[in-house]
């Protein structure tokens, strides 16, 4: 039997205490029925001299970790889609985990027309999360997202080009937990002369990706811990989500953003970790 570290033990104890506190303090109803539907739109401006003038004001919307289930439903997804379209994005990216349990979910076909309603002139891109590969869901995810109008990436690369010839780069890595991420084969294609965006589900990929010319990494996976304690932060974070847990970080010239996601897994609770849609606006400083 694998021994538990002191830190893991303490986190488990805090988790049990927090669950008890939520129940005893009447916070359970808030964490179960209110906060999971309090979707925040977070806005960030990304500045770089590598961003061409033609891409100044270019708007990217990220959503992540829908975990469609009985707890985050199709009605919730409709609200998300309306919110995203109202922001008038140029590009939409989904950073993994569309369905909580792909092998048991009963409404795959109903998801497709909702995803088709998302509009962005430069397209809709998505990557795999661990739940998309899990439960024999790899092919299901690709079929569903493609039918919904998304380009599905696994260790992919492309450039976005304007009529004036200006470009930015987008790369993606397969899921770290259940996929086969190809760091060198994918990221060696990036140029240090172009502004680059990396899509990867697990944020701690940045421990390796900052060795490459990545300017902006967009990730999800952690749900912001899903349950946080004041002055302590997330009680439990998943594998590959221990270092970067939520929000914006900067390491050298790389900005790393960890979206808190939309749905829930394991426990149908969110506390001090509201679901999130993120809007990024590119700003040229050249």
From Swiss-Prot:
The terms under GO molecular function for this entry are: metal ion binding; UDP-2,3-diacylglucosamine hydrolase activity
Q: Which GO terms describe its biological process?
A: lipid A biosynthetic process
| PROSITE patterns per UniProt | TAT
Q: Which GO terms describe its cellular component?
A: membrane
What does its PTM field state? Answer: Predicted to be exported by the Tat system. The position of the signal peptide cleavage has not been experimentally proven.
Q: What are the binding positions for a divalent metal cation 2 in this chain?
A: 97, 130, 221
The record's InterPro entries line, in alphabetical order, gives: Calcineurin-like_PHP_ApaH, Metallo-depent_PP-like, Metallophosphoesterase_sf, TAT_signal
Residues the entry annotates as binding a divalent metal cation 1: 65, 67, 97, 223
Keyword set includes Signal: yes
* Range of residues in the leader sequence: 1-31
Q: Write out the entry's keywords from A to Z.
A: Hydrolase, Metal-binding, Signal
**Belongs to which family?**
Belongs to the metallophosphoesterase superfamily.
Q: What is this protein called?
A: Uncharacterized metallophosphoesterase YkuE
Taxonomic classification: Bacteria, Bacillati, Bacillota, Bacilli, Bacillales
């Amino acid at each position: 039997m694998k021994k538990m570290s002191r830190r893991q033990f303490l986190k488990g104890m805090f988790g049990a205490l927090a669950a008890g506190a939520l129940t005893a303090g009447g916070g359970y109803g808030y964490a179960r029925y209110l906060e999971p539907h309090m979707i925040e739109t977070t806005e960030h401006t990304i500045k770089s001299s590598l961003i061409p003038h033609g891409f100044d004001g270019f708007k990217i919307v990220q959503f992540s970790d829908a975990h469609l289930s009985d707890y985050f439903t199709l009605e919730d997804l409709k609200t998300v889609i309306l919110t995203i379209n109202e922001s008038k994005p140029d590009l939409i990216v989904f950073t993994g985990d569309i369905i909580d349990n792909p092998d048991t979910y009963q409404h795959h076909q109903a998801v497709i027309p909702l995803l088709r309603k998302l509009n962005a002139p430069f397209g809709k891109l998505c990557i795999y999360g661990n739940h998309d590969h899990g439960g024999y869901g790899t092919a299901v995810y690709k079929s569903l997202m493609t039918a919904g109008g998304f380009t599905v990436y696994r260790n992919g690369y492309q450039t976005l080009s304007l009529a004036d010839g200006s470009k930015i780069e987008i790369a993606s890595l397969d899921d770290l937990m259940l996929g086969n991420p190809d760091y060198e084969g994918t990221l060696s294609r990036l140029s240090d002369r172009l502004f680059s965006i990396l899509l990867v589900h697990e944020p701690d990929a940045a421990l390796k990706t900052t060795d490459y010319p990545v300017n902006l990494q967009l990730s999800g996976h952690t749900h912001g811990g899903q349950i946080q304690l004041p002055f302590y932060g997330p009680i439990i974070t998943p594998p590959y989500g221990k270092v970067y847990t939520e929000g914006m970080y900067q390491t050298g010239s790389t900005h790393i953003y960890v979206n808190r996601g939309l749905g829930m897994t394991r426990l149908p609770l969110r506390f001090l970790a509201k679901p999130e849609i993120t809007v990024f606006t590119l700003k040229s400083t050249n």
